[in-house]
Design a protein with these regions (language model features):
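Residues on the lipid-exposed face of transmembrane beta-strands in outer-membrane beta-barrel proteins
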Residues: 26-30, 62-66, 109-113, 157-163
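Signature for the C-terminal beta-barrel architecture of outer-membrane proteins
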Residues: 36, 44, 62-71, 77, ...
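Flexible loop and strand-edge segments within Gram-negative outer membrane beta-barrel domains
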Residues: 46-53, 57, 73-120, 126-152
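Outer-membrane beta-barrel architecture
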Residues: 7-11, 25, 34-36, 73, ...
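Short strand-turn segments of transmembrane beta-barrel domains in outer membranes
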Residues: 2-30, 41, 46-53
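Membrane-embedded beta-strand positions of outer-membrane beta-barrel proteins
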Residues: 10-14, 39-41, 64, 76-78, ...
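Outer-membrane beta-barrel channels and translocator barrels
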Residues: 32-35, 67-71, 81, 115-118, ...
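Short, intrinsically disordered, charge-balanced linker/junction segments flanking boundaries
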Residues: 1-4, 132, 161-167
Length: 167
C-alpha cells in the first residue's frame, strides 16, 4: 500500500452494524517530490452473533519510500496486528473459554527497480508473532490450567525480476 498521487490525502471511516459490530479506520498518504509515506490504523470489533463469539482487532501499517530516480525506489514498511477472539463451538455442543490472543507483525526494507520491460526488487523481511491460545473445554470437562503459547520469527531475503515480453 502506497500513496501515489502528489500531495496529502487523509481518509476516515466509521461503520456500525448488527451485533454491536464497529469498524473504525483512518489513513494518511503523503507524496512530495521524491518522498512518499502512507500510514493507516484500523479497529474492528463485534459482540458476535451468539454468546462467546466476540472478536476484535486493531492493526496498523506504515510505509515510507524514497525515489532516487525513474529506475530505483527505496521502500520500508511495518505492519502490526493485535487481535482477540473467541470460538463458541457448535450450537449443539458449545465450547467454553476457547479464546485466542495474538500479536503479529512484519517489517521489510526493499530496493525496487523499473527499467520498463524489466522490473523487480530485493527485499529484506522479518515476520514475528506471539500467540496465546486457550483450547477451551466442553460441558462436563474441567477448564484447562495452561495455554498454548507460540512465538515465531521468520527472517529472509526476497529477490525477483520480472520480464515483460509483450506490450
Amino acid at each position: 500500500r502506497r500513496h501515489h498521487a502528489q500531495g496529502r490525502r487523509t481518509q476516515a471511516r466509521i461503520m456500525y452494524g448488527s451485533y454491536n459490530t464497529q469498524k473504525y479506520m483512518v489513513n494518511n498518504g503523503y507524496n512530495i517530490g521524491k518522498f512518499s509515506s502512507f500510514v493507516s490504523i484500523n479497529h474492528d470489533r463485534t459482540d458476535g452473533h451468539r454468546k462467546n463469539s466476540d472478536f476484535w482487532i486493531t492493526n496498523g501499517f506504515a510505509n515510507l519510500g524514497y525515489r532516487f530516480n525513474d529506475t530505483y525506489h527505496l521502500t520500508g514498511d511495518v505492519s502490526l496486528a493485535k487481535y482477540k477472539f473467541q470460538n463458541p463451538g457448535e450450537t449443539f455442543n458449545p465450547i467454553f473459554d476457547n479464546k485466542m490472543d495474538i500479536l503479529r507483525g512484519t517489517t521489510s526494507l526493499g530496493l525496487e527497480n523499473d527499467y520498463g520491460q524489466i522490473s523487480g526488487a530485493i527485499r529484506l523481511f522479518y515476520n514475528w508473532g506471539n500467540h496465546k491460545i486457550n483450547d477451551g473445554y466442553y460441558s462436563g470437562e474441567q477448564p484447562l490450567d495452561y495455554l498454548f503459547r507460540s512465538t515465531d520469527h521468520n527472517l529472509g531475503v526476497l529477490f525477483y525480476e520480472s520480464f515483460r515480453l509483450f506490450e
